[in-house]
Amino acid sequence: MWKFNIIQNWNCIWEKNHIDKWNELLKQSPTSHVFYHPLLVQIWVNTYMPLRNLAPIFVWGESLKGNKVFLPLVLWKKNWKNAFIHTIIPIGYSDYDYHDPLFLEHPTDKELSSFWEELIAKLRTFNADEILLTGFRDGCHIKDNHWTQDEICPSLDLTKFSSEDDLMSFFGTKLRGDIRRQIRRLEEIGSLKFVEYSSVQEIPTGVFEQFMDAHCKKWPKAYKAPNFHNLLVESCSTNGPIHFSVLLLNDEAIAWHLGFEWQGVYYYYMPAGNPKYLKQSPVKIHLYNLIVRAINKGYYLYDHLRGDETYKTGWSDGFQYVNNRCVRNKCMSSKIKHCFIKLKTLIG
């Protein structure tokens, strides 16, 4: 039911004709998301190519009825520390939240089922030890026992708001009062200003470094690939798809945010706050400013992305889940590799 064409050459992938075809589908697809924007994909690839042995498996497909699909994957050939396991993963893997295929039209249940069945059969021909399909939202996976439900992804429908007052009315009494109180407390200290940057040249020296330092202190165990976030910020713009902003108090940064925006959706990706102002909740006030900005720009959704952090409850009115599937190679060599990894984990 599906015919696949797989691109396995990086030079072909970055050719203008291919990028144009990719961009066209990205703009038309009902399953479109910012994480498969060519810019974000290229930044991820440029980050990890010096760190990992990655080979492209960029899948283009067409059904008998003319539906089209694009799904960028890579074959990750791991080193001896990981038993030389070969794993097929989506582009972006753990750094990007969603990996939904880009369909030209919403696939029917039958079409979606055959897509996954036939694609997995095609991917098996690469003789990888495992195929890890992670980060596929509801509607882009099959509801069967092969797939497991993963993290919740809260979001806020912005179409119900036409102004900042509408947003305030939506918030619960406690949150609404806290926002007003913290803004008042900050303004008593000095001038409070929300600033976004149209290019990396506008970002004052030291701002990015302060942002990363604050984030690392808040989440010290979170892996950050060398230069990844720097490359993202270097491509920031007020017109997307990469957005970088700060909340200033008397010209001192008290909160930062690196996020994305694409086709009416704002993605709340990487916030950080200045620990010096922890009691004034600067991250919360920055989030408020970002949502107001999204309303003013006419966006229809504010996506809080993956995670069930408590704070998201008061800032969202909907949710969906991401789903995963793992397909293991049943050959003896693959079983031995996985046994080695399991034993290594048990030993610690």
Model regions and ranges:
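Generic hydrophobic alpha-helical segments
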Residues: F115-L119, L232, L343
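A short, structure-level motif marking secondary-structure boundaries and short turns
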Residues: L104, L167-M168, K218, N274-Y277, ...
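A general structural signal for short secondary-structure boundary/capping elements
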Residues: D178-R181, S199-Q201, R293, H304-L305, ...
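Short, surface-exposed, polar/charged, turn-prone segments marking secondary-structure boundaries
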Residues: Y98-P101, T159-F161, R181-R185, A222-A225, ...
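Acyl-donor binding region in acyl/amide transferases
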Residues: A55-P56, W60, K78-D150, Q263-F319
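Active-site/acyl-donor-binding loops of N-acyltransferases
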Residues: W2-F4, Q8, L75, R137-F170, ...
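A conserved beta-strand-loop-helix scaffold within acyl/acetyltransferase catalytic domains
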Residues: W2-I88, T134-C153, F161-S163, L167-K279
